[in-house]
Every structure is written in C-alpha cells, then in structure tokens.
Amino acid sequence: MVDVLGGRRLVTREGTVVEAEVALQNKVVALYFAAGRCSPSRDFTPLLCDFYTELVSEARRPAPFEVVFVSADGSAEEMLDFMRELHGSWLALPFHDPYRHELKKRYEITAIPKLVVIKQNGAVITNKGRKQIRERGLACFQNWVEAADVFQNFSG
C-alpha cells in the first residue's frame, strides 16, 4: 500500500468509496494533480485515460497501476464534472479531504497538470510522468515498475 495514502478513502467517478490500502496494494501509483478549468489538464487527461485504459484493460492481465486524482478544481461539483467528462476509471482523493493540500506541498506542485509517479513508500519515481507518457507512451510504464519494486515480472 502506498504509505502516503495510508488510512485514506478514495472515490471513483461514480461516487463509490474505496479504501486506499486495498485499491493501491502492490501497484505503481501516479498522483494526477489537475483541474477541469485548466486547458492543459483538459488536453492531457484524454491521453492519460487512453494510457490507463490500455494498461489495466480486462483483455489482458491488468498492469499493477493506479491513478489517484488530486483535484485543483474550485469546487466539488467542478471536480466531479471533470471526472465524469474526461477521466478514466481511476480513483480520486475526495474534494473535501484537506490532505489534497498536503500532497501538493509534499510533491512541490506549483503548476498543473502534473503526474507524479510514486513508490509504495511515497518516494518519487518521476515527477515528469506527463512528459514521459507524451514522449514514450506505454514504454515508460516498464521503467516505472522496475523503479517501484513491485511485480518485477510484469511484461508490458
């Protein structure tokens, strides 16, 4: 389980609440800092959605990967609209969870969108996830898995 999210509850775009410990166990986790009102976020999110869907698709063995959206939206309604419109079936920290602000500070988020890929202990694998996905597509995931020390036998 990703220590940085230990004890937290996450939500799906449908509103289902899940325990972070269960949902993130033995997975590479990408914290996605973004907002629906942000043009670059709206531009990158469909690409992230395709990347995510390809990795965790049911057609093959799902990859050990999960995205956790950390909203920079102005309201819970804006966050939910953004999630329903463009997001994949990944998870989110609830809008009213003040921990969103702590994560932004911890990972030094000064601009959005930002995709920070982390190890189970919360250490950063890369804070350039967005750039890596744009430049390398699915190929970057294997590097993340190796750096994360989870499921070393994953074959992308």
Curated annotation (Swiss-Prot):
One of its GO terms (biological process) is sensory perception of smell. Disruption phenotype: At 10 months of age, mutant animals show signs of photoreceptor dysfunction. The progressive loss of cone function is followed by cone cell death, while in rods, the outer segment length id reduced, but not rod cell death is not observed. At 12 months, mice present a stronger age-dependent impairment of fine odor discrimination than their wild-type counterparts. Both isoforms are expressed in retina, in the photoreceptor layer, and throughout the olfactory sensory neuron layer of the nasal epithelium, in neurons. Also expressed at low levels in brain and testis. Residues 9-147 form the Thioredoxin domain. InterPro entries: RdCVF2 (IPR029519), Thioredoxin-like_fold (IPR012336), Thioredoxin-like_sf (IPR036249). It comes from the Eukaryota. CDD domains: TryX_like_family. May be involved in the maintenance of both the function and the viability of sensory neurons, including photoreceptors and olfactory neurons. In the retina, isoform 1 may be required for rod function and isoform 2 for cone viability and function. Belongs to the nucleoredoxin family. This is Nucleoredoxin-like protein 2. It comes from Mus musculus. The lineage of its organism: Eukaryota, Metazoa, Chordata, Craniata, Vertebrata.
